C-alpha cells in the first residue's frame, strides 16, 4: 500500500503540504478500519463455527430416532429453535448446554422436564422422550466419527429392544434404555481416556527413575495439568450422578412412559432407575479413584524430585563453602608469609630458625582455622527436624 500512496503523496506535495497530510491520514485510517473489520469478521466466524445455534437460520442440527430406533429422515436435519422448544416443552435456557463452544463442556447435566429429559455428558448432547431420541451435533458438522457411529449403532440396538437369542427383551422403558446407552458410551470414552492418561503418566514416571532433566520435568508438568482437567471432569460427573440419586422427585419424574400413559410414579417408587444409576455411579467412582491415585503418584514423585534437587543444591553449597574455607585457611598462611617477607628489621632474621618458625606457625594457623571452620560447618549440617542443632562429637 505504501508503494501506491507515495506517488500520490509526491503529487500532493507539489500542491500543498496540508493536502499531503490529509491524504496520508485518510489512507492510514482506512487501513486501520479494514484491519478492525477483518478482526470482527474472524471473531464472528469463529463464534459461528463454535456454536450449534445458527444466528442466520435459527436452527439446530440434530438426528432423530423413533420408537423402533430408526433414524427419522435417514440423516441429521436442522430444526428451528422455536419449534424445538414448543414441541418438546422446553425452556429457552435448556438449550444453553448444546449451544456453547464446540469443545465439549466439562460440566455434565441431566435436566428433567415434563415430557423429556435433556442430557449433556462429555461429547453427547441428547433429548430423550418416551418414544423419541434427539441427538444434537456438538460440532455443527456431520457426525461421522468412529466413536459416534458405534454409539448410534448401540443406541439403535437398545431402542429396538428385540432381544438376543436365548434372552428376553429389556424390561426397562424406552427412555431408560436410551439413557443407559448414553451412560455406557460416556463411561467407555471416559475409561479410554483414563487408560491413555495412566499409560502416559506411568511412562513419564518410569523415565524419571533413570534421570532427571528439564525436558522430562516439563513433560511431567504438562501431564499433571491434563490429569487435573480429567480429574475435574470425572469428579463433576460423579457429583452430578450423586445429586441425581439424592432427588427422589426427579427420579420419579424420569418415568416418562408411565406419565404418558397417565400413571405417574410415586415419589419413592424408583428402584429400577436407582439401581441403573448406582451401577454407573460405581464405575465413575472407580475412575475418579484411579485418576486420584495417578495424581497422588505424580505429586509424590514431584516431592521426591524436589528433595533430590534440594539435596544436590545443598551439596553444591557445601562444596563451595569447603573451597571458601580452604582459601581462607590458605590466606592466613599467605598473611604470615607476607609479614615475614616485609623488608623490615626484626629479631627473627637474627637467628637460624626464623624460616622454620614462620613456616610452622603459618601451617599450624592454617590447620587450626580449617579444622575449626569445618567443625562449625558440620555442626550446621546436623540440624534436627525440630529446628535445633544436633550434638556434634
From Swiss-Prot:
Cell compartment(s), UniProt: Mitochondrion inner membrane
GO cellular component: mitochondrial inner membrane
Keywords: Ion transport, Magnesium, Membrane, Mitochondrion, Mitochondrion inner membrane, Transit peptide, Transmembrane, Transmembrane helix, Transport
Disulfide bonds: none
Topology of the protein relative to the lipid bilayer: Multi-pass membrane protein
Residue range of the transit peptide in the UniProt record, numbered on this chain: 1-45
InterPro entries for the chain: MRS2-like (IPR039204)
Location of the motif YGMN: 340-343
Gene3D superfamilies: 2.40.128.330, Magnesium transport protein CorA, transmembrane region
Domain of life: Eukaryota
Pfam family, one: MRS2-like
Molecular-function GO term, any one: magnesium ion transmembrane transporter activity
CDD domains: Mrs2_Mfm1p-like (cd12823)
Chain segments annotated as transmembrane: 323-343, 350-370
GO BP annotation list: mitochondrial magnesium ion transmembrane transport
Protease found in the keyword field: no
Statement: the UniProt record of this protein carries the keyword Transport: yes
Function recorded in the entry: Mitochondrial inner membrane magnesium transporter required for mitochondrial magnesium homeostasis. Modulates the conductance of the MRS2 channel. Involved in the splicing of mRNA group II introns in mitochondria by affecting mitochondrial magnesium concentrations, which are critical for group II intron splicing.
Subunit structure: Forms homooligomers. Interacts with MRS2.
Family that this chain belongs to: Belongs to the CorA metal ion transporter (MIT) (TC 1.A.35) family.
Protein name as catalogued: Mitochondrial inner membrane magnesium transporter LPE10
Organism listed in the record: Eremothecium gossypii (strain ATCC 10895 / CBS 109.51 / FGSC 9923 / NRRL Y-1056)
Amino acid at each position: 500500500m505504501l508503494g501506491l500512496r507515495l506517488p500520490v503523496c509526491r503529487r500532493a506535495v507539489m500542491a500543498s503540504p496540508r493536502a499531503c497530510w490529509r491524504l496520508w491520514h485518510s489512507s492510514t485510517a482506512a487501513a486501520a478500519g479494514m484491519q478492525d473489520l477483518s478482526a470482527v469478521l474472524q471473531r464472528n466466524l469463529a463464534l459461528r463455527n463454535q456454536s450449534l445455534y445458527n444466528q442466520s437460520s435459527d436452527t439446530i442440527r440434530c438426528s432423530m430416532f423413533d420408537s423402533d430406533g430408526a433414524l427419522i429422515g435417514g440423516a441429521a436435519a436442522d430444526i428451528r429453535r422455536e419449534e424445538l422448544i414448543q414441541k418438546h416443552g422446553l425452556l429457552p435456557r435448556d438449550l444453553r448446554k448444546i449451544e456453547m463452544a464446540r469443545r465439549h463442556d466439562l460440566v455434565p447435566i441431566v435436566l428433567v422436564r415434563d415430557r423429556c429429559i435433556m442430557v449433556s455428558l462429555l461429547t453427547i448432547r441428547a433429548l430423550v422422550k418416551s418414544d423419541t431420541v434427539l441427538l444434537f451435533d456438538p460440532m455443527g458438522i456431520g457426525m461421522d466419527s468412529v466413536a459416534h457411529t458405534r454409539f448410534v449403532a448401540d443406541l439403535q440396538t437398545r431402542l429396538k429392544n428385540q432381544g438376543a437369542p436365548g434372552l428376553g427383551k429389556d424390561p426397562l422403558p424406552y427412555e431408560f434404555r436410551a439413557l443407559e446407552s448414553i451412560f455406557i458410551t460416556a463411561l467407555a470414552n471416559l475409561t479410554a481416556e483414563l487408560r491413555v492418561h495412566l499409560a502416559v503418566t506411568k511412562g513419564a514416571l518410569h523415565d524419571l527413575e533413570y534421570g532427571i532433566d528439564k525436558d522430562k520435568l516439563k513433560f511431567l508438568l504438562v501431564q499433571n495439568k491434563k490429569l487435573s482437567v480429567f480429574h475435574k471432569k470425572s469428579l463433576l460427573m460423579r457429583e452430578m450422578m450423586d445429586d441425581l440419586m439424592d432427588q427422589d422427585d426427579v427420579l420419579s419424574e424420569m418415568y416418562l412412559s408411565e406419565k404418558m400413559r397417565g400413571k405417574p410414579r410415586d415419589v419413592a417408587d424408583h428402584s429400577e432407575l436407582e439401581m441403573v444409576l448406582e451401577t454407573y455411579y460405581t464405575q465413575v467412582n472407580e475412575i475418579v479413584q484411579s485418576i486420584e491415585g495417578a495424581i497422588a503418584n505424580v505429586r509424590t514423585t514431584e516431592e521426591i524430585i524436589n528433595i533430590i534437587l534440594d539435596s544436590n543444591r545443598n551439596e553444591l553449597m557445601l562444596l563451595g563453602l569447603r573451597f571458601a574455607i580452604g582459601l581462607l585457611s590458605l590466606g592466613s598462611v599467605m598473611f604470615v608469609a607476607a609479614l615475614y617477607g616485609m623488608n623490615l628489621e626484626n629479631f627473627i632474621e637474627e637467628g637460624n630458625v626464623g624460616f622454620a618458625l614462620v613456616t610452622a606457625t603459618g601451617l599450624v594457623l592454617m590447620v587450626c582455622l580449617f579444622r575449626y571452620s569445618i567443625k562449625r560447618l558440620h555442626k550446621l549440617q546436623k540440624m534436627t527436624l525440630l529446628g535445633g542443632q544436633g550434638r556434634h562429637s
